[in-house]
Amino acid sequence: MEEPPEGHGHHRDAAPPGPANGGGGGGGGSDGDSAPVSPSPAPASPAAPCPLPLPRRRPPPPPPPRTTNFFIDNILRPDFGCKKEPPAATGAATGAGGGGGGGGREQRDGAQSAGRENVNPLLARPPHAPSSALLCPDSNCAPDGSAPAGTAAKANPGTAAGAAGAAGAAKAQGDGGETPAAKYGEHGSPAILLMGSNNGGAVLKPDSQQPLVWPAWVYCTRYSDRPSSPRTRKLKKKKTEKEDKRPRTAFTAEQLQRLKAEFQANRYITEQRRQSLAQELSLNESRVKIWFQNKRAKIKKATGIKNGLALHLMAQGLYNHSTTTVQDKEESE
């Protein structure tokens, strides 16, 4: 009689875990609901490839600045600075833009074959520039002798290096319809001639290994060595007016006689004697002083005898050079 209630009670006690289990099931259901939420980042996985194209557009880190070896033999060559380089285009340029750039290159190639052999694209524009190539900034290339591209390259070589690296992806789009001969001109292959190699000649490098080549004049520090400097040098006008020289002092016979007498008395005149003599002869003190100096120099040159101090210094090896005194033309006798 008591067992059924116990069994019933036991069943009643076991019932509460049922809701717990149901709650657990509900919890499991909630976990099941949260499980679809966890893969919600999975739709972001298609967007994950977005950073992947960035390495294609983003240029590789620019190489450290290197010093191009160039020699005077290369600079003196008639074709110096006029080697052809594949034109550069920006990474964001569309296929139509690349095609337009290709058309511009074909026109320039036609102009080259017409006789402008020195016109060649050499430097690349910054990334914000259009996809058209720049012509060689050599003074023989441009009719006005200006070098806009050279100025940009000299101002910021690192920007031009980055633009050249960023242009690698868009070259294939813009140059797809061109033949190698039309694309690369006389070379007919995706290669560039490097000036200033170790052996002094030209070196062919494939397009994949193509470094950014700068002409030698970029490294010149004098503006006269650059193509942008004027080819004609203006001659400085010589001064037609001669510098006014003091007229030669003409001593009178009385003045010369008085000066010679003072010189016989003492070859070195004192300041007091010089002032009194200049006042007496109506001469400037500097004229009296210079006359005494010239008189001593003339006697020394005529006799060739050095004073005792000079001989003493020469014996010690401290005075071994001969001195010549420039005589003033004002000396008169």
From Swiss-Prot:
Q: Domain of life of the organism in this record?
A: Eukaryota
Biased composition (Basic and acidic residues) is annotated at 1-14
Among Pfam families, the record links this protein to: Engrail_1_C_sig, Homeodomain
Q: Name one GO cellular component term.
A: nucleus
Q: What spans are recorded as compositionally biased (Gly residues)?
A: 20-31, 94-104
**DNA-binding region, residues:** 244-303
> Which Gene Ontology molecular-function terms are recorded?
DNA-binding transcription factor activity, RNA polymerase II-specific; RNA polymerase II cis-regulatory region sequence-specific DNA binding
Keywords noted in UniProt: Developmental protein, DNA-binding, Homeobox, Nucleus
Q: Does the keyword Ion transport apply?
A: no
Q: What's an example GO BP annotation here?
A: regulation of transcription by RNA polymerase II
Q: Where is the composition biased (Low complexity)?
A: 144-173
State the similarity comment.
Answer: Belongs to the engrailed homeobox family.
- PANTHER family, per the entry: HOMEOBOX PROTEIN ENGRAILED, HOMEOBOX PROTEIN ENGRAILED-1
What protein name does the entry list? Homeobox protein engrailed-1
